[in-house]
Structures are given as C-alpha cells and as structure tokens.
Amino acid sequence: METKQTYSFDEAFQASLAYFGGDELAARVWVNKYAMKDSFGNIYEKSPEQMHWRIANEIARIENKYKNPLTAQEVFDLLDHFRYIIPAGSPMTGIGNNYQVASLSNCFVIGLDGNADSYGAIMRIDEEQVQLMKRRGGVGHDLTHIRPKGSPVNNSALTSTGLVPFMERYSNSTREVAQDGRRGALMLSVSIKHPDSEAFIDAKMEEGKVTGANVSVKITDEFMQAVVEDKTYVQQFPTNSSEPSVTKEISAKALWEKIVHNAWKSAEPGVLFWDTIIRESIPDCYADLGFQTVSTNPCGEIPLCPYDSCRLLSLNLYSYVIDPFTDHARFDMELFKRHAQLAQRLMDDIIDLEMEKIDLIMSKIKTDPQVDEVKSAEYHLWEKIKKKSCQGRRTGVGITAEGDMIAAMGLRYGTQEATDFSVDIHRALALNAYRSSVTMAQERGAFEIYDAKREEKNPFILRLKEADGQLYEDMKKYGRRNIACLTIAPTGTTSLMTQTTSGIEPVFMPVYKRRRKVNPNDTDVHVDFVDEVGDSFEEYIVYHRKFLTWMEVNGIDTQKKYSQEEIDELVKRSPYYKATANDVDWLMKVRMQGEIQKWVDHSISVTVNLPNQVDEELVNKLYVEAWRSGCKGCTIYRDGSRSGVMISVSKKDKTKDEKPVDEEKAKDLNSAEEHHEHICNHPNVIEVRPKELECDVVRFQNNKEKWVAFVGLLEGYPYEIFTGLQDDEEGIALPKSVTKGKIIKQTAEDGSHRYDFQFENKRGYKTTVEGLSEKFNPEYWNYAKLISGVLRYRMPIDHVIKLVGSLQLKNESINTWKNGVERALKKYVVDGTSASGLKCPVCGQETLVYQEGRLICTNCGASRCG
C-alpha cells in the first residue's frame, strides 16, 4: 500500500496561512476541521489546494460515468480558493477521504411509520438518532405522534408521561454523542395542534434542560388566524384525526404570547410556518409515496420526510461582483447562471459519492464484531436512507456572501433596493439550477418517481413556469433529475474560509478589536497595555475582509492605526453602515427573507439579531410579519438572552426602568450608537493563553473532604480554574500558608500540554506541583474545563456563578464540589454587583448585592456567605 506523506500541524498551518493571505482564523479552522486526517490525528493535506484536488478528482470520476463529463481541472477551477463553489463541511471533509467511514450528508430526518409512540418506537428513534450523529449527520425528528400527558397506556404507569421527558432523553443522547470530536446536532419539533405543545414550548425555559436540541413549533395558518382575530383554538390528539381521543380548547393568543415571550427571553422556540412549508413543498406532491415532510434539519433550512437526507453546497455571491465597491460595480449574471447550472451538476455527482459512502458504512456494519441482533438496527437504518436518497436525489444548492455582495454593489442590506436586487439573483439561481436538473434528466435519467401531473399545481413549479415557459415544457417532457434542489444554509465556518459574510446574513461586525502579547523590546511593536505581572500587549484592529477591500478600493490607508472616532466615521462612510446584524432594519430583513423564499424550494436559515432592550411586542411583530411575508420559518436572538453568549457592551448600564425601544424607532431602526456600544468595545479576549498566569489558592470542604481550587488570573480577572483533593496520596500536598502562586502551561515534545502549579515557601524557595489535571477525578476535571472556557471569554463572573449553580449534576459529592467552586468565584465579583433574580431570604425583596464574596441585602441588611 502506498505510504502517503503526512504533515505536522505547524506545517499545514503555515501553508494554509499563506493560502488565506495571512488570515489566521481561516487557516486554523481549515487545519482543525477540514484537512484530511486519520483516526490517529495524522494530517495528510498541507493546504486547501490539496483538499480541492481531492474533491475535484472524485467528482471527475463520477462525471466520467455520464455524458459530457467535466474534467478534474474544470471542477478544481470552480473550487479553488473558495472562489465560486464551496461544498459544505461534510462533503468537504468526506469526499475522497478513506480514513473515515462517514456520510457526506449534512442533514437527516427520521421517523417511524404507523403508531410510533410506544416505548419501543421511542427507543428505536433514540438509537437511530445516535447512529446518524456518529457518522457526522445533523438529525431532526417530530414528536407530534407522542400521546399527550395523562393519556391512558397499557403498562404499569397507566397514563402517558407526555412528550417533554422524551425531549430530555433525545437531548441527552445528543450531548452524549457530541464528545471527543463526534458531531451532535438535533432538531425537535411538534405541531401547535398537539395538546402538549405548551409544555414543549416551556421545556427549555428551565436552565440546564433540553440543552442538546433546537426546538421549533409547527404553526398552522388556522392557529395564526385565531391569534390575529383573538379566537379560541382547538388542540387534539391525534392531530390529524377526524375522531380524536383528546381535545382541548385554548386561547390562541395566550399560547402565542408564550411563544413570543420565550423566544424573547431565550431565543427558543423557533417557529415553522407549517402550512406554508407543505403548500410550497415539491416533495410533498409525492407524500403518498413516502415523501411527506415531517420535520427539518437542526438549522431549519431543509424540511424533510423520514429517512431522507441532504447534502449542501454554496455559491460565493461576492465573487460575481465585477469592480466591487466602485460606482461602476456590476454583477456578472452570465457567469453566475453558468456556475449555478454546474453547481447543481456537482451536487448530483455528490449524491453518487454518498451512495458509495453508504455502501462502505453498511459493509463496515456487516464486518463489525457485534452479533447481528445489535447490528441489524443500524444496517436497516442505512438501507432506508439509501433507498430514499436514490428515489428523490434531493440536493441543497445555496449561497453565501449575500451581505458582502449587496455592499459590493453599493447597496445597503435591509433596503427595498437591495431586496429587489437579491430577489433577481435568487430567481436566476432557481431557474438555472432547475434547468441543470432537467438537462441531467435527459443525460442521466429523471429521479425515479417523477410525475409532472402530480406537480402541476405546486406554487413553486408555477412560478418557474411563469418565469421560463420553455423550462417548464422541457421539464414535463424529460423530467427532472432531483426532487428538490435549493436551500440557504448558515454557512458558518465555511464562510470563514471564503472570508465573507455567512449565508444570507448581513455582516456581523465590520470592525473589532483584539489584543496580542508582544516583546516590549521589539522596536516594531506598540505597547498598549501592561498587565500586573509585567507582560506587554499590543491592541490591534481586525477588519472584516471585505470591509478592508472597501477601504483599499476607496484609497483609505489600511495600515494606519485609527482612533475610535476615525473608525466610527469610516463605518458611516461605508455600505456596511446600519447594515450589520444588530442594526439592520429588522422588519425589512424578514420581508427580504419572504421575498427570496419564493425562489427557494426548501427553506432558509436566518436569525434576526435584536438589541437587548427591545420589548416582546417587536418579537411578536417580526413573527407575524414572517408568516404574512411567506417565510417558512423564523428565529430571533435578542442580545444577551442566552447566558454564555458574548453580548454587546452598552454605553450606559440598562436599568429596569429604562423604556424599551419605541415603535417608531423600531421601524426606523436607530443607529448602533443609540442602542449598543460601537463594535470595537467588546471585552478583550486573549487569543493565546500566556505561559504563566498568577494564581489564587482557595480551599473548601467537599462533604468531609478537604479540597483546593487554583484560580488562574489574567489582568486580575479569573481566566481558568483547577480543583482537586488536598492531603491525599493521589491529591495535592500543599502547605496551608500557600494562598498564591503561578499556573505554568508546559508543552511536551509531542505537542501535548500540562499545567503545573508553582509557589514560593516562607524561605523564598520555589516548589512546583506538576500535572494539576492528572490529579483530579476526570468528571470534576471536565466540569472545571467547562467553567474555564466561559471565564476565558469574559462572561461576567456573576453570570458564571449562575451558570455553575444551574448545572444538573448526578450525586451529592459533585454537587457539594459545585458549591465550593461557586464560593471560590464569588470573591471576584465586583462589590455592589446586583444578584439578579435572587430574593433576600429574610425580607423577600430582590435587593441582594455581592460584597466581599458575600450576599448583602440593601433593604434589611441581612447577609449570608456565598
């Protein structure tokens, strides 16, 4: 067997850094996530160029099976430098990669036929979910078939528990599989007509519950009409039965207000406008043949029937703008149309490659050492997926860089002019993707259940007919290769490599600030900050890559170090002004999604980002507007509504008495300066941990055991925490007089890391305790890593304490340990910080503040130890 060359991480990183023009984040993401590796971590690709040749050669191999094949060079030219066509993560990693037995599909939906709410059926779905996740797939499934709480059952429980406990089961399975590099992503959905839908909507409001799943409610037009008209609504089970066993009359408006409140408070549930999805769905023209849509993938952009799957690919819209950011910028529509047809063709080739991967998976299952009774469920699962994939040959051609394309054309995201332009682009994409699918039907054959008669009244097909009559006639004559073709996904890390905005979204921030450690004796650096241990740091501005291009095109010095005021002025002059994720016109963004949705046969994944201080009424308006505009789904995120997510830093502290954004301002969209601090004033995050950190030593009792916590400090702020037993043969022997020291990160020759603690004794001699992490119970160590992660990214300490307190842990010992960690961290809370959400146990008022690590009531003076 041929021995392939391997590369060290540094070799691959340096080569990729040059490939991406010095973009460290893009290079690091590519090496970590997409470079071909084996199970031992050996790296077989030095740069994305080698990856693109790997993909091009495999696609060309498939092309040679059919008429008019593309060459490997032609495919490579489409992929090179992520310029035109970008396969999504699973295809990019898996195509031509024989070191992993994994699927090329990004998304799956599962669900059993018939009466599927028995324990056996629920366990089978749980198993199938895990089996798909371990092969890289994101999974969605619907819970509408589960009997509502209190329904009679023929087992020892006598009545059904309802669907919420099973949400937690499926969520925990996802969290379990999403470890050690495996992927876990889950969507759970339920119909608003289900009697337990309110419990489903509330399930994630309790901290620590259903944390491994996204949840969305399938909303019907009937329900929305009842909301608008403030009428009652009847829920029932089964939801589609003419003779339901359970009925329940509710106030539609009250339940809707709960959806709105929960979305405002925690960003979930998302809403799926289910009647719109089904009405527009081409696969549902074949519902009786097994293509009835039941749920979506985790991000919501691909509604699917059970056991169908989809692979994703994006066109980089920015690359089709000629002379970007100039007065004569124009979009190369002819090149785009040609590439849209080729993108659809490449997607069809990837289906053939996926069939090969599924065969490999099934072959591996057969040869696994387990007994057939264990293996048969997974084998049968992949049989069902292969059959459905062959029947429909579903694809997910989409786009990225919409926000940058709009800016490069001199338009402002969120205006009617920009929306009209985007609609033209997506109409062209739809017509040419479908044209390509018809051409492939002539050359390769139509998907096996194609029937023009079934589709003739479908609204999407009728729009194609109106826009291009010849395409429609050819489709009736020759058929179509793919049952559905289009989507718009959140392109995530792939947009880091295209160095553009993600998917259909606007730019998140055009400018932000980072800090790096420097040698103060180096004449080429400027020291902006010196920490308490004497380390020097230089602050530097990071520009969104296309904002930098705008500066260059307009003759603005990109090397100059600008003041905050100068940066503000630059942003105001640019096409990105009032067009970022947080200050775009929200209602126009929703309307834009609805307009574009008319030319996307699957769905669109979009998040509407809102400032922290908006009220629930705005969320209500956005959701109702999304329904009326023809969106298939909608998700909102209010800044700061989820702990652990970095929030915008306000110019002034927001108080409970501050008025929400009024309606007129919400319509007109105030500038970022009115609602949030400018983009450059986020907390500073040090990208690379310094080798040494100052450390506080905090001791506490865990049951009857003596424990010690080592709190690493950066700029006086907790950065990491280590915990372990004291005075034990396997623990940490430490004099009681030691209260401070240093945590030193050591790197071994093999690249692995360990953390040592060093302190000075009373005589001034240094003592080093090696390998802190090796001295801890792995369960405690994993929780300590979680806590260190949020500390590192500067979540406020009082929020970290709240997060630690919300951890749902298994036994008394680890819960006592958790309480000790909370006490250790409370000493770092700034005196006077309000303990939001906590009431004084004496007077019952919400007037507790932190003072010297204790909670003090400002109303009655009571105090208690943290």
Residue ranges, per PLM feature:
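Internal maturation/activation junctions in enzymes
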Residues: F76, F237-P238, H339-K386, C390, ...
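Catalytic alpha/beta core of large soluble enzyme barrels
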Residues: E24, V294, G300-I302, E354, ...
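Cys/His-rich microdomains that often coordinate metals
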Residues: E846-L848, S863-R864
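Short, Gly/Pro- and small/polar-rich lid/capping loops
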Residues: Y472-D474, S650-V711
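Conserved, charged catalytic cores of large soluble enzymes
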Residues: E2-Q73, N155-R169, Q179-F291, I322-T326, ...
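Short cysteine-rich clusters marking metal-coordination/redox-active sites
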Residues: C840-C843, C857
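Function-dense linear segments that define catalytic or interfacial modules
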Residues: M36, E58-K65, L78-N155, L163-F166, ...
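Cysteine-rich micro-motifs
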Residues: G853-S863
